[in-house]
A protein has these predicted regions:
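Outer-membrane beta-barrel pore domains and translocons
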Residues: 136-140, 256-258, 296-298, 359, ...
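Outer-membrane beta-barrel transmembrane strands
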Residues: 230-249, 256, 341-379
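Short, small/polar-rich motifs associated with maturation and membrane association
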Residues: 7-277, 290-291
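Small-side-chain secondary-structure face that scaffolds active or pore-lining regions
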Residues: 262-274, 284, 296, 304-309, ...
Length: 379
């Protein structure tokens, strides 16, 4: 690392870690470099805030915590150029990744690097004469990694016991729970729990009944995860590159495409697409002068059900709010206003992000171990 006009070796306390890109990123199908780094490097914390496809990972170095109003994210540099999100970079274009912690990085890169720096270098042109054309693609499948166990009969018993403790005899809303109803729900589970499917219609007398006080008592329990989350979804990745050298000019041209389907079952559309393109050219004009130019383009499209507005709340909140006997349909088979229904009729939201950068630079070597670099980037 160069400090002004002198250089020094980086000690282990300054450089948190270097990534073996071949083993970490290239050996497995990943949607973006951030997710690929999760759990692979000491000192680097990568958290995916939700299971939403296309969501940016939250990255922190050594657990840095900022102020209440300020951020604590590290500075991300790709070929010495800052980018707003690591997700816009095609993992197949990465040649090396290094992590610098706050003290060393702030002295080099300034205040923006107070919480560390992620240094990413992209692939360059070939060192030997010739051209290499390559393609790699894969089809992978994903499922939910952690499923919360939704309470069934035990939730009914807890709710009823809480009401009885304060002198009540009936609990719930829309579909009520009484002591008699709870005992019949236990019988329903023993008799019908393994027989009635989640999509089977409701049957009066079997799944619910009306008591002497004209209250609807629900007996059948539901697992909202079945209605909200798919068992698996596909992801496809395609990468094409041309790498070579002709005379004193070396080059690397690459294209990438990611198509990912989300796990939300009732959504009309739930997908994420990313398009990447990059080019790097370098020419050794003389023994002491090298000219470099490059360009980077990234486009991200995300489509999802927008089911939260002024009259609705987060469907995932209502999954845990409603009791296990709250039905997915009315006794006539019409859908109730439940989380799955809200998402199935919601409008589709479109989120598009475009990023482009162009750069050019000169590398002057007047003598051995003395390199002078001039770089200009427009993004």
């Amino acid at each position: 690392i160069v400090f002004g006009d002198w250089s020094s070796d980086v000690c282990s306390s300054d450089l948190v870690s270097s990534v073996n890109v071949e083993k970490t990123l290239e050996a497995r199908p990943i949607a973006d470099a951030g997710r690929g780094l999760q759990g692979t490097m000491p000192g680097l914390s990568v958290v995916i805030p939700s299971g939403e496809i296309g969501s940016d990972p939250i990255m922190k170095i050594r657990g840095q915590i900022g102020s209440l109003q300020g951020g604590s994210s590290p500075l991300i540099l790709v070929d010495n150029v800052e980018i707003p999100s690591i997700q816009m970079l095609n993992p197949d274009d990465i040649e090396s990744i290094s992590i610098l912690k706050d003290a060393a990085s702030a002295s080099i890169y300034g205040a923006k690097a107070a919480f560390g720096v992620i240094l990413i270098t992209t692939k360059k042109g070939a060192k030997n004469q010739g051209v290499t054309v390559s393609y790699n693609g894969n089809l992978s499948f994903q499922n939910i990694s952690k499923k919360m166990d939704m309470a069934g009969l035990d939730a009914l018993e807890y709710t009823l016991a809480a009401f009885e403790r304060v002198g009540g005899t009936v609990a719930g809303a829309f579909w009520m729970v009484t002591r008699e109803g709870y005992e019949k729900a236990v019988e329903w589970q023993e008799k019908w729990g393994d027989v009635v499917g989640p999509d089977d219609p409701m049957v009066f007398g079997r799944d619910w009944y009306v008591d002497a006080n004209s209250r609807k008592i629900g007996l059948r329990t539901y697992d909202p995860y079945y209605y909200m989350v798919k068992e698996w979804t596909p992801t496809q990745l395609h990468n094409f590159s041309v790498n070579g050298k002709s005379g004193n000019t070396d080059y690397n041209i690459s294209l990438g495409y990611l198509d990912q389907t989300g796990l939300i079952k009732p959504s009309k559309i739930d997908d994420f697409k990313r398009y990447n393109g990059s080019i790097k050219l370098g020419t050794q004009v003389t023994d002491w002068l090298r000219v470099n130019v490059g360009a980077l383009y990234s486009k991200r499209n995300k489509r999802y059900a927008y089911a939260t507005n002024s009259t609705t709340a987060d469907p995932w909140l209502y999954i845990y709010r409603w009791g296990p006997t709250y039905p997915m349909t009315t006794e006539d088979g019409d859908p109730t206003r439940n989380p799955a229904y809200e998402m199935s009729v919601a409008n589709t939201a479109f989120q598009m992000n475009n990023y482009a950068s162009m750069n050019g630079g000169l590398e002057i070597t007047p003598m051995k171990n003395w390199n002078i670099n001039f770089d200009y980037t427009y993004s």
